[in-house]
Amino acid sequence: LEEAVLGKTRCDDLPGAQVPERYFTYLKTGEFALLEDVLRHNFDDIQSLAELTAVICSAYRQPELLRYEQDILSVGKTLLHGRRTQQARNCLKILGHSTLAPQAHLYLASSYKQGREWTEAAELWKTMIAKGEGGAWPYIELAKYYEHVQHDYDIALRYATSALQYLLN
């Protein structure tokens, strides 16, 4: 993780798996020199955790600066789970024209539905259908929307039928 995210490589580091053995040997022998490598290893761990925390905080403050689309999607999902809805939506919208747009649209539309922001949800479901995203899901959601929110049963039936046709093909 240190190398992949922080670009740091440890030199002459005590492997973490050896730490318990060194510590227990120290307890038996009282030889403090055995702990020097352990303490350096732990210090490096703590320093790296602080640096990783700064990287993560930066990712949440400015997700648009993240290098990988998957990281942006992950930040958006985490913000949704943390009920930071507007920040999550802004984050997911960054992915609007990316290869992860279909997944981002699923989460974004679900967020609108959960917030009872029906116009935004319905428009996004229609966009998903137009782009061939989401499988039968946007058809099903639109069928429920037209049945339960708009009370337009003819349109609801059309979307339900389209969902069924999609699933049968």
Where are these regions (language model features)?
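DEDD superfamily 3′-5′ metal-dependent exonuclease/proofreading module
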Residues: 1-169
